[in-house]
Amino acid sequence: MKHFPSKVLTTAILATFCSGALAATSDDDVKKAATVAIVAAYNNGQEINGFKAGETIYDIGEDGTITQKDATAADVEADDFKGLGLKKVVTNLTKTVNENKQNVDAKVKAAESEIEKLTTKLADTDAALADTDAALDETTNALNKLGENITTFAEETKTNIVKIDEKLEAVADTVDKHAEAFNDIADSLDETNTKADEAVKTANEAKQTAEETKQNVDAKVKAAETAAGKAEAAAGTANTAADKAEAVAAKVTDIKADIATNKADIAKNSARIDSLDKNVANLRKETRQGLAEQAALSGLFQPYNVGRFNVTAAVGGYKSESAVAIGTGFRFTENFAAKAGVAVGTSSGSSAAYHVGVNYEW
């Protein structure tokens, strides 16, 4: 529905009031009703398209009085859709359903299979109702009341079946609405059963009256009773459809449970991955520290002169880590020497590395 600008609506309202100021009272009533209709259409447009603080809104009193005001934040908050409008709410809902649809496609296909079976049963119910209508057409004027009741029952049953089809089509939009839709179907079918019982009761009363007034009504009463039996059979078929609808709802519940289990497993895996990331980070740091310490140790010198000690120091690094090494050595002969060293990283939490070596030359 188109959203009317407030200036256009205001002009329409003033024109409606002013154009017939000198007309009769009945014309004033017509113009007032037309104005109320315009305002109602504007309000309907806001309910569909939404509104925000500062826009013009109209209130219609019980006596038809129209009040114009600027919408406040409180008016937006008090709105059923928080000012978003039915169109935006449906868009958001559709987006949410589309995001969740990939996770439940397999389960929804299973539900759709059950729905197709239910639709077949409902088609059988339609055929049974058609037979009921044909039998009711043959009822005489003495059973007109019975015929009217059964016809009403058949029409209401068809209406309920249409509602069931509409609710089943909504399964593709959101799984969460399955249970509510099927409950509505069950309520409608319960009401249908009650009306069928009332129709049978009325048929029995009409039969008794017909026997007292007309001899040939027996055969037609029997036909009417047969029609009532078919109506009860149709109601039974509808009950079977409701049972299958409940089974589909149970499957939907299983789907939700599976989704919850998957979410819990994903959460556990996420925790394990976080722990693994931490361990990898620690290993990376220790590896870099070790390489830095080895670089420092490799820079230490051994003594050259026979009978001499030496003290040596060196630094080393690898990427962001660095280390300091110190060492000492002693040359026993021209051919034989020994040395030892230790290195420590400069960052906190570093471990020490060391080496001891001998050298023999010939």
Curated annotation (Swiss-Prot):
Q: Where would you find the membrane-spanning parts of this chain?
A: 307-317, 321-332, 339-345, 351-362
Pfam families, A to Z: YadA_anchor
Q: What induces it?
A: Barely visible in early log phase, levels increase to a maximum in stationary phase cells (at protein level). Transcription is repressed by NadR (FarR).
**Biological process according to GO:** cell adhesion
* Coiled stalk domain: region residues: 170-307
Q: What compartments host this protein? A: Cell surface; Cell outer membrane
Q: Which family does it belong to?
A: Belongs to the autotransporter-2 (AT-2) (TC 1.B.40) family.
Which function does this protein serve? Adheres to and induces bacterial uptake by human epithelial cells. Upon expression in engineered Y.enterocolitica confers an 11- to 15-fold increase in bacterial adherence and uptake by human epithelial cell lines; part of the uptake is mediated by integrin beta-1 (ITGB1) suggesting it may be a human receptor for NadA. A bacterial cell surface protein; antisera against this protein induce complement-mediated killing of this and other strains.
Annotated protein name in UniProt = Neisseria adhesin A
- What taxonomic lineage is listed for the species of origin? Bacteria, Pseudomonadati, Pseudomonadota, Betaproteobacteria, Neisseriales
